[in-house]
Structure formats: structure tokens, C-alpha cells
Amino acid sequence: MDPELLVSIYASTAVSVGIILAAAGLGSALGWGLICSKYLEGIARQPEMRPQLMGQMLFTGGLMEAFPMIVLGMSMWFIFANPFTGAALAAIGS
């Protein structure tokens, strides 16, 4: 087994995981920005709806924050239990 192949697989996986985590963080930040801006717009239009809007905003934000945590778990799986190394070993017959 060529050690350079394993190094290449792990390096590509690390770069890919970094890109995936950055995209999830960016999506979460943009989502929070949109949710909060719409919340403030709703309060400006109907101030008496503030408690209901706040509850819905926090619930939606909590659901939205679950996505980066799921992505983090999947990324850790790719880093620590890399499925691509086994496939590469099987493909080259080692």
C-alpha cells in the first residue's frame, strides 16, 4: 500500500470537511440574520404580536441550529472513521 495514497485521501477529506463545515456555519449565520430581520419587521408592524413572534422565532432558530450540529457529527465521522480508505484499499487489492 502506497502511503502517499493514504495521505492524499486524508488530506482531501480534511479539506472537504473544512468546506462543508464552513458552508454549514455560513448557512446558519445567514438563516439567523433572516429570521431576526423578519422578527423585527413583524414587531414593527404589529407590536402586540411580540410574544408570539418571539416564541416562533426561537423555535425556528433552534431547528435551524440543529443543521450545523448534524453536519458537525457527519464531518467527525468522515475525519475519524474515514470510509474512503477502506474503499481505496479494496480497489487496489491490498
From Swiss-Prot:
Which Pfam families does this entry report, sorted A to Z?
ATP-synt_C (PF00137)
Q: Which GO terms describe its molecular function?
A: lipid binding; proton-transporting ATP synthase activity, rotational mechanism
Note the topology in the membrane. Answer: Multi-pass membrane protein
Site, Reversibly protonated during proton transport: residue positions: E65
Q: Which GO cellular component terms, listed alphabetically, does the Swiss-Prot or TrEMBL entry include?
A: plasma membrane; proton-transporting ATP synthase complex; proton-transporting two-sector ATPase complex, proton-transporting domain
Query: Which UniProt key words apply to this protein?
Result: ATP synthesis, Cell inner membrane, Cell membrane, CF(0), Hydrogen ion transport, Ion transport, Lipid-binding, Membrane, Transmembrane, Transmembrane helix, Transport
Annotated transmembrane regions: 15-35, 61-81
Identify the domain of life.
Bacteria
**Which PROSITE patterns did the record assign?**
ATPASE_C
Task: List locations, semicolon-separated.
Answer: Cell inner membrane
Tell me the function of this protein. Answer: F(1)F(0) ATP synthase produces ATP from ADP in the presence of a proton or sodium gradient. F-type ATPases consist of two structural domains, F(1) containing the extramembraneous catalytic core and F(0) containing the membrane proton channel, linked together by a central stalk and a peripheral stalk. During catalysis, ATP synthesis in the catalytic domain of F(1) is coupled via a rotary mechanism of the central stalk subunits to proton translocation. Key component of the F(0) channel; it plays a direct role in translocation across the membrane. A homomeric c-ring of between 10-14 subunits forms the central stalk rotor element with the F(1) delta and epsilon subunits.
Q: Which family, according to the similarity comment?
A: Belongs to the ATPase C chain family.
Subunit details: F-type ATPases have 2 components, F(1) - the catalytic core - and F(0) - the membrane proton channel. F(1) has five subunits: alpha(3), beta(3), gamma(1), delta(1), epsilon(1). F(0) has three main subunits: a(1), b(2) and c(10-14). The alpha and beta chains form an alternating ring which encloses part of the gamma chain. F(1) is attached to F(0) by a central stalk formed by the gamma and epsilon chains, while a peripheral stalk is formed by the delta and b chains.
Q: What is this protein called?
A: ATP synthase subunit c
Name of the gene this protein is made from: atpE
